[in-house]
């Protein structure tokens, strides 16, 4: 892919936005090196990586990547036998910590059944060096300072040094407290000169304290003197400082030597973590842009649904459907300038580059985009009315280069094709260039304001016309792309709206040839029919989306029901048994007391009555239900075939075999639900005489699925707890393993109330405040059982 095309389509601006989502310089560097791939399998892999990253962000909100640092230069120094300083060692330790946390994080996701084939394999490459990490953690802090816990010798030296410094300060403070201090000292402070503790003495009293003069004030009136009484203590202090420095150097050298044995492993861990940071940055970028993972085509098929230009304001940009490569391979967009034709070209081109770089694209679900070997673009500033020869020459030079390199795996974007020269010659050139591009097998989208090219889409089976809608009421373009409808002139309508005399407009219409007038009327009619069809299509698509959501909800609820049913029955039976056992024990005690009374001579209590009472209590105890799959009666096994009616033994439901997955498993249609069922769990049902049935179809719009977070900021206390209760039910039904509840920091009352409520909820496994990247103690993370 040419860098020139990336610049024309502003792919560099996308990369700049993407860097804002990286957590480390390693992620940023990977983004700067990002370029569109042209190999179909490579693009598939990078898209799947991003999709897996997005899945993790949806489930967990974030990943433990904070603290990752570029340590490759540190490892280079270790390779040549050099020692690292404390900060460099800490940064390596931080990377080891992130490696361990990331591996544990990924293992937790994999253990609960989250499918992450690519990122799971990437996680497997991380090596946990727990002992090395711990050695660094007890040796240096985040500022690079060597800690007392690094060695016993260092701890002893520093303890002795602190005591010595205390003795020096105590002695000097005694001078400051002396009753003559105000007379002999310039200021009652202890300071340091030449790394020695000194006091500021007035010039005339320098002989009173003896010792060494280390400095004097600018005026010479104050001398900074180390009194003779602390010289020896200061000397001892200096000696201890030298020992401390020597021990620190020994510790750093020792740790550096131990790290040198793991250079390759640390290098690989850092590289893998950089990949994770890059992938999560792509995922977070896609989430912020409300983007989707597109289907990929290796056959030049593009079908973008509600595609938006990613660099324009999402609240204002007009989304358009763009399709190419099935019924036609060339689109000619006609119509006046400033109508949004160029934005359409750039949207298609930029989304292609993004998709081939492994980025999600701003469009709706089920959008398809092609993977091209080459993307060519001849797009310039063609908005001015006057075109110079130099501009025409520049465009033609570019087009010559494009036609010399294009192949059948190419996408060409021509903006204002043939502009800058005589209109008649320019239109003829444009047609010839489009034919030449098609002959090379390329996919082409071209814009032009030449009316002569309107016929191109009708005269060529591989081509179609398109236009950008214009609202004559507001005298402005709507930026809505209309594929299949050529652009028409709006000059008469605009003139009438602006107040031009109707007589002039009528005369002007009479000067236009009948064929052109009829063509404009036909285009106008096409636009109206197209708008009506699009409205009906959108309504149908919305209904289909609602039906799809309903089906997903039902599938999830039915699956959860069958999974939980037996468990709930057994739990209820066990609880009932516990209650009865307790009652039985109490009854046993009562019976024992009654028997004792009988032995002591109490009358009226029969032995058989006691036995009967105990037997009745024992029979009241329910037995724990052990649910097993009912076994079909032994008979000659039936050879299952597609279309057979069957009973699913574990569910007690009837269904129909759709297709065989393997000898051990079938796809079975159970009502409106399609499920994978093991062959041993199926029982053949003899076909019954068909009965006439009345089929009633009803589509209801399902509610929005529960989000992974609940925002309570600004809510009253009682209302907030009600919302939490309802939200937890929705989140459990949606299958989230954990959710985030945002309550803010404030006075802490809401946070405390929410925390107490969560502690007593039967389905909550654990709660914790969010990490810094998750919102700190303004957010509570809830993990379900």
From Swiss-Prot:
<dbReference type="GO" id="GO:0005524">
    <property type="term" value="F:ATP binding"/>
</dbReference>
<dbReference type="GO" id="GO:0140664">
    <property type="term" value="F:ATP-dependent DNA damage sensor activity"/>
</dbReference>
<dbReference type="GO" id="GO:0072344">
    <property type="term" value="P:rescue of stalled ribosome"/>
</dbReference>
<feature type="binding site">
    <location>
        <begin position="335"/>
        <end position="342"/>
    </location>
    <ligand>
        <name>ATP</name>
    </ligand>
</feature>
<keyword id="KW-0067">ATP-binding</keyword>
<keyword id="KW-0547">Nucleotide-binding</keyword>
<keyword id="KW-0540">Nuclease</keyword>
<dbReference type="InterPro" id="IPR000432">
    <property type="entry name" value="DNA_mismatch_repair_MutS_C"/>
</dbReference>
<dbReference type="GO" id="GO:0030983">
    <property type="term" value="F:mismatched DNA binding"/>
</dbReference>
<dbReference type="InterPro" id="IPR002625">
    <property type="entry name" value="Smr_dom"/>
</dbReference>
<keyword id="KW-0694">RNA-binding</keyword>
<dbReference type="GO" id="GO:0045910">
    <property type="term" value="P:negative regulation of DNA recombination"/>
</dbReference>
<keyword id="KW-0699">rRNA-binding</keyword>
<dbReference type="GO" id="GO:0043023">
    <property type="term" value="F:ribosomal large subunit binding"/>
</dbReference>
<dbReference type="Pfam" id="PF20297">
    <property type="entry name" value="MSSS"/>
</dbReference>
<dbReference type="GO" id="GO:0019843">
    <property type="term" value="F:rRNA binding"/>
</dbReference>
<dbReference type="InterPro" id="IPR036063">
    <property type="entry name" value="Smr_dom_sf"/>
</dbReference>
<dbReference type="GO" id="GO:0006298">
    <property type="term" value="P:mismatch repair"/>
</dbReference>
<dbReference type="Pfam" id="PF01713">
    <property type="entry name" value="Smr"/>
</dbReference>
<dbReference type="InterPro" id="IPR036187">
    <property type="entry name" value="DNA_mismatch_repair_MutS_sf"/>
</dbReference>
<comment type="function">
    <text>Endonuclease that is involved in the suppression of homologous recombination and thus may have a key role in the control of bacterial genetic diversity.</text>
</comment>
<keyword id="KW-0378">Hydrolase</keyword>
<comment type="similarity">
    <text>Belongs to the DNA mismatch repair MutS family. MutS2 subfamily.</text>
</comment>
<dbReference type="GO" id="GO:0016887">
    <property type="term" value="F:ATP hydrolysis activity"/>
</dbReference>
<keyword id="KW-0255">Endonuclease</keyword>
<comment type="function">
    <text>Acts as a ribosome collision sensor, splitting the ribosome into its 2 subunits. Detects stalled/collided 70S ribosomes which it binds and splits by an ATP-hydrolysis driven conformational change. Acts upstream of the ribosome quality control system (RQC), a ribosome-associated complex that mediates the extraction of incompletely synthesized nascent chains from stalled ribosomes and their subsequent degradation. Probably generates substrates for RQC.</text>
</comment>
<dbReference type="InterPro" id="IPR007696">
    <property type="entry name" value="DNA_mismatch_repair_MutS_core"/>
</dbReference>
<dbReference type="Pfam" id="PF00488">
    <property type="entry name" value="MutS_V"/>
</dbReference>
<keyword id="KW-0238">DNA-binding</keyword>
<dbReference type="InterPro" id="IPR045076">
    <property type="entry name" value="MutS"/>
</dbReference>
<dbReference type="InterPro" id="IPR005747">
    <property type="entry name" value="MutS2"/>
</dbReference>
<dbReference type="InterPro" id="IPR027417">
    <property type="entry name" value="P-loop_NTPase"/>
</dbReference>
<comment type="subunit">
    <text>Homodimer. Binds to stalled ribosomes, contacting rRNA.</text>
</comment>
<protein>
    <recommendedName>
        <fullName>Endonuclease MutS2</fullName>
        <ecNumber>3.1.-.-</ecNumber>
        <ecNumber>3.6.4.-</ecNumber>
    </recommendedName>
</protein>
<dbReference type="InterPro" id="IPR046893">
    <property type="entry name" value="MSSS"/>
</dbReference>
<feature type="domain" description="Smr">
    <location>
        <begin position="710"/>
        <end position="785"/>
    </location>
</feature>
<dbReference type="GO" id="GO:0004519">
    <property type="term" value="F:endonuclease activity"/>
</dbReference>
């Amino acid at each position: 892919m040419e860098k020139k095309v990336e610049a024309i389509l502003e792919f560099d601006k996308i990369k700049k936005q993407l860097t804002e989502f990286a957590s480390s310089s390693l992620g940023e560097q990977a983004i700067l090196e990002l370029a569109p791939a042209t190999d179909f399998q490579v693009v598939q892999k990078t898209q799947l990586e991003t999709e897996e990253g997005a899945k993790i962000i949806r489930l967990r909100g974030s990943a433990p990547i904070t603290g990752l640092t570029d340590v490759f230069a540190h490892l280079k120094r270790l390779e040549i036998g050099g020692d690292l300083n404390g900060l460099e060692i800490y940064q390596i330790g931080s990377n080891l910590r992130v490696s361990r946390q990331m591996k544990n994080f990924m293992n937790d996701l994999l253990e609960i059944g989250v499918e992450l084939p690519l990122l799971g394999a990437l996680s497997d490459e991380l090596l946990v060096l727990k002992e090395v990490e711990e050695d660094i953690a007890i040796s240096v802090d985040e500022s690079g300072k060597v800690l007392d816990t690094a060695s016993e010798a260092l701890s002893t030296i520093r303890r002795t040094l602190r005591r010595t410094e205390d003795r020096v300060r105590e002695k000097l403070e005694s001078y400051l407290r002396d009753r003559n201090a105000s007379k002999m000292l310039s200021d009652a402070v202890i300071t340091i000169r030449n790394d020695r503790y000194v006091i500021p003495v007035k010039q005339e009293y320098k002989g009173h304290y003896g010792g060494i003069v280390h400095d004097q004030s600018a005026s010479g009136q104050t001398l900074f003197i180390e009194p003779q009484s602390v010289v020896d203590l200061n000397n001892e202090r200096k000696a201890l400082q030298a020992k401390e420095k020597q021990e620190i150097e020994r510790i750093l050298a020792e740790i550096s030597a131990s790290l040198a044995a793991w250079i390759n492993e640390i290098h690989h861990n850092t590289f893998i973590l950089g990949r994770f940071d890059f992938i999560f940055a792509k995922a977070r970028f896609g989430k912020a842009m409300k983007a989707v993972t597109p289907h990929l085509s290796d056959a030049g098929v593009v079908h973008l649904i509600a595609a938006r230009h990613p660099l324009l304001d999402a609240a204002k940009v007009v989304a358009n459907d763009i399709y190419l490569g099935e019924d036609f391979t060339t689109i000619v967009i006609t119509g006046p300038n400033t109508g949004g034709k160029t934005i359409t070209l750039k949207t298609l081109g930029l989304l292609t580059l993004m998709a081939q770089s492994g980025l999600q694209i701003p469009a709706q679900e089920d959008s398809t985009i092609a993977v091209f070997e080459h993307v060519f673009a001849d797009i310039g500033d063609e908005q001015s009315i006057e075109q110079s020869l130099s501009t025409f020459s520049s465009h033609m030079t570019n087009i010559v280069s494009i036609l010399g390199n294009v192949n059948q795996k190419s996408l060409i974007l021509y903006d204002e094709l043939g502009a800058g020269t005589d209109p008649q010659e320019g239109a003829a050139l444009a047609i010839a260039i489009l034919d030449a591009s098609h002959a090379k097998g390329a996919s082409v989208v071209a814009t032009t304001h030449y009316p002569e090219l309107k016929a191109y889409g009708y005269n060529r089976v591989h081509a179609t016309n398109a236009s950008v809608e214009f609202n004559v009421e507001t005298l402005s373009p709507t930026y809505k792309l209309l594929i299949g409808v050529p652009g028409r002139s709006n000059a008469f309508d605009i003139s009438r709206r602006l107040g031009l005399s109707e007589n002039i407009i009528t005369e002007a219409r009479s000067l236009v040839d009948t064929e052109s007038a009829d063509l404009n009327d036909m285009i106008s009619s096409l636009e109206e029919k197209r708008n009506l069809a699009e409205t009906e299509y959108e309504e149908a698509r919305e209904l289909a989306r609602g039906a799809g959501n309903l089906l997903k909800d039902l599938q999830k609820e039915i699956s959860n029901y069958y999974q939980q049913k037996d468990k709930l029955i057994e739990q209820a039976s066990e609880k009932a048994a516990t209650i009865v056992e307790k009652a039985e024990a109490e009854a046993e005690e009562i019976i024992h007391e009654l028997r004792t009374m009988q032995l002591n001579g109490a009358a009226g209590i029969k032995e058989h009555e006691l036995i009967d009472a105990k037997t009745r209590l024992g029979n009241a105890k329910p037995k724990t239900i052990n649910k097993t799959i009912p076994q079909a009666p032994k008979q000659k096994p039936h050879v299952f075939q597609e279309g057979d009616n069957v009973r699913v033994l574990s569910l007690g439901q009837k269904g129909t075999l759709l297709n065989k997955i393997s000898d051990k498993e079938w796809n079975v249609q159970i009502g409106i639900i399609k499920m994978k069922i093991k062959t041993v769990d199926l029982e053949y049902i003899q076909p019954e005489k068909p009965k006439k049935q009345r089929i009633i179809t009803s589509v209801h719009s399902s509610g929005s699925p529960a989000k992974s977070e609940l925002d309570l900021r600004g809510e009253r206390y009682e209302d907030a707890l009600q919302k939490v209760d309802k939200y937890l039910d929705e989140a459990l039904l949606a299958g989230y393993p954990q959710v985030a509840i945002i309550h803010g920091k404030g006075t802490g009352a809401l946070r405390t109330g929410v925390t107490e409520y969560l502690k007593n909820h039967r389905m909550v496994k654990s709660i914790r405040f969010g990490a810094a990247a998750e919102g700190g103690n303004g957010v509570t993370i809830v993990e379900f059982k």
